[in-house]
């Protein structure tokens, strides 16, 4: 079964990647790299780290057209900062992967459907 693991961070808790020192980036990057290497057989798409939510643009479809605004689609402190796609036997295995991720305060797990 394929699952998307979305890595979420609390924007008010600690520095963002861009705010970290090069040394802190290297340390955390190494931990994340090891996590990817240890789980390479189960991760089928390494995904990407996403830019800060302050760089987001949102299109809201309304009657009569779309409204485009700067910023994320929800107001809140916790935002998606990256993702991977895992191919694992079941949700329990996806949870085991999520529990070992070395960064981010929350990992949201969603199954992928066969529908586009």
Regions found by a protein language model. Name each.
Residues 1-116:
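Conserved, structured core segments of small domains
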């Amino acid at each position: 079964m394929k699952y998307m693991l979305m890595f979420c961070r609390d924007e008010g808790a600690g520095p963002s990647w861009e705010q970290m020192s090069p040394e802190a980036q290297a340390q955390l990057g190494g931990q994340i790299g090891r996590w990817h290497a240890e789980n390479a057989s189960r991760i089928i798409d390494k995904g990407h780290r996403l830019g800060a939510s302050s760089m987001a643009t949102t299109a809201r479809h309304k009657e009569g057209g779309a409204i485009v605004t700067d910023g994320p689609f929800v107001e809140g402190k916790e935002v998606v900062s990256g993702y991977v796609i895992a191919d694992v036997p079941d949700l329990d295995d996806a949870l085991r992967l999520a529990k070992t991720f070395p960064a981010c305060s929350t990992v949201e797990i969603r199954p992928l459907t066969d529908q586009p």
